[in-house]
Amino acid sequence: MAKQTPLYDQHLACGARMVDFHGWMMPLHYGSQMDEHHIVRTHAGMFDVSHMTIVDLHGTGCRDFLRYLLANDIAKLTEKGKALYTGMLNASGGVIDDLIVYYLSNDFYRLVVNSATREKDLAWINEHVANYPVDIQVRDDLALIAVQGPDAQAKVESLLNDEQKQTIAGMKPFFGVQAGDLFIATTGYTGEAGYEVALPKEQAADFWQKLLSVGVKPAGLGARDTLRLEAGMNLYGQEMDETISPLVANMGWTIAWKPEDRQFIGREALEKQREEGTEQLVGLVMREKGVLRGGLAVSFTDEMGTLHSGVITSGTFSPTLGFSIALARVPQGIGEQAVVQIRNREMPVQVVKPSFVRAGKPLV
């Protein structure tokens, strides 16, 4: 039986088409995925992301533990509330999960991990925490609502009391702070400004209704996927998994190589990969008719005339751009043009950096 978030009844009341998403009943759309996409790019939309797992770490060993567990270095986090995006890797350098970690105090960190990887994430964390004085608390008592778009922050702020407004005033991107009952973070998965709000699950339905009352529109998994793909953001299980390293998945920037004496899980494997070279993640644009889809083959000829092949990891029609875009894993040496096999046709595609739209503005 698929699980329900605290907002299940609200989704039904909003006319959602519900689907089973990794064991959770979640809204795919509320009538028009395209409209929901555009609302987030131009005004404000909200997503129920309560299926994601919030894990709080308390104790004097948190800092040392997370510096060993994660590829990025939480020692960079010196300002209270600052967040970091990172991979949690296995010994061979594969990505067990990508996650966000918030520094809330020297002995309090908060992780937000993916829903599909919940059980293996918790098992991995518990397996490696044994030697550290750390208490792990899974926050199943919290719901999580992402409000995204150019008007999103103003809409959320209109619902806050004066003390909460003061708490979040001037908060920079990629920070999180506790404001009364709400944990408010300037993070997201759309390429737009916004807030992700964690709150006691018994308050979630009321907060959702208040957001509706100030004109925030609900958006489902369909729009969430096209928005994140336009923004060039990875989806676990497509751009990376336990067999794919961050170096291959355009996550090299999330690996903290220095200090060189910091030992983290997967470091040795990554150093070898960095030396030997890896495949890379690129963006593809197809202005011809048709849609690029995950799993399609990509081919190109390098400067030496050698034919190489790769694969599309995620692809879609871009509602913002009006043509098809994709992320693809390919060998090094690709130029500005490639070919994608769609049914029996070879379609020309342009190779670009793996990011297409940010803050509503086209990058291609």
Swiss-Prot record:
Pfam families given for it? GCV_T (PF01571), GCV_T_C (PF08669)
UniProt keyword Protease present: no
Q: Which InterPro entries does its entry note?
A: GCS_T, GCS_T_bac, GCST_C, GCV_T_N, GcvT/YgfZ/DmdA, GcvT/YgfZ_C, TrmE/GcvT_dom1
Origin, by domain of life? Bacteria
- Which UniProt keywords are present, listed alphabetically? Aminotransferase, Transferase
Q: Which GO cellular component terms, listed alphabetically, does the Swiss-Prot or TrEMBL entry include?
A: cytosol; glycine cleavage complex
State the similarity comment.
Belongs to the GcvT family.
Subunit structure, per the record? The glycine cleavage system is composed of four proteins: P, T, L and H.
Task: List, alphabetically, the PANTHER family matched.
Answer: AMINOMETHYLTRANSFERASE, AMINOMETHYLTRANSFERASE, MITOCHONDRIAL
Protein name in UniProt:
Aminomethyltransferase
Organism per entry: Photorhabdus laumondii subsp. laumondii (strain DSM 15139 / CIP 105565 / TT01)
Gene that codes for this?
Answer: gcvT
